[in-house]
Regions:
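Positively charged n-region of N-terminal signal peptides that target proteins for export
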Residues: 1-4
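Bacterial N-terminal signal peptides
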Residues: 6-15
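Boundary at the C-terminal end of the N-terminal hydrophobic targeting segment
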Residues: 18-22
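Short, solvent-exposed loop/hinge segments that bridge or flank secondary-structure elements
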Residues: 23-55, 91-107
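Sequence contexts marking disulfide-bonded cysteines in secreted/extracellular proteins
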Residues: 31, 68-76, 102-104, 111-113
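A structural signal for short, hydrophobic beta-strand segments that form beta-sheets
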Residues: 33, 82, 140-142
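N-terminal glycine/threonine-rich, aromatic-flanked beta-hairpin/loop signature
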Residues: 39-85, 123-133
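Beta-strand-rich cores of mature extracytoplasmic or soluble domains
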Residues: 86-144
Length: 144
């Protein structure tokens, strides 16, 4: 009985081990999407935490910031579940699997901070397009 309980608890805790702390105010900033060769694209995003709600602005090239997701409707950004994060991570190379992801998402995309599993303070970001049942991961660089 005790062995069965320990196994069950271990299985329940396993998804949590691969999930980072949720995004917080330190993740506010400006980011640029990278292409498949990790070169910057013209698409830039700005994530801002207003109270407990994330909002996103976007711009192309050096243009003006435009509101994209302002915390309402289908564009509202919410904290992602461990199950969602696990599903998105499957689309990344094996080298990313052990790292800890904390994400926000809506119906169209997810934005994730990745904390390195063994090197404290080493952080990266991914953006996942969620379209037509497909998950398309794109790396992101922080600008500010």
């Amino acid at each position: 009985m005790t062995k069965t309980l320990l196994i069950a608890l271990g299985l329940l805790a396993a998804p949590l081990a691969a999930t980072a702390a949720p995004l917080d105010s330190s993740d506010q900033g400006e980011y640029v999407l990278l292409d498949k060769d990790e070169n910057p694209t013209p698409m830039q995003m700005q994530f801002v935490l207003q109270g407990k709600q994330w909002i996103m602005n976007g711009r192309e090239g050096g243009g003006q910031w435009q509101p994209v997701c302002q915390g309402t409707g289908e564009c509202r950004l919410v904290a992602s579940s461990a199950g969602e994060v696990s599903r998105w991570k499957k689309n990344l190379p094996d080298s990313w699997q052990p790292h800890n992801f904390g994400c926000i998402n809506n119906t169209a995309f997810a934005f994730c901070r990745v904390d390195h599993a063994s090197e404290a303070g080493r952080t990266g970001y991914w953006w996942f397009a969620l379209t037509d049942g497909r998950v398309v991961p794109l790396p992101v660089n922080r600008l500010q």
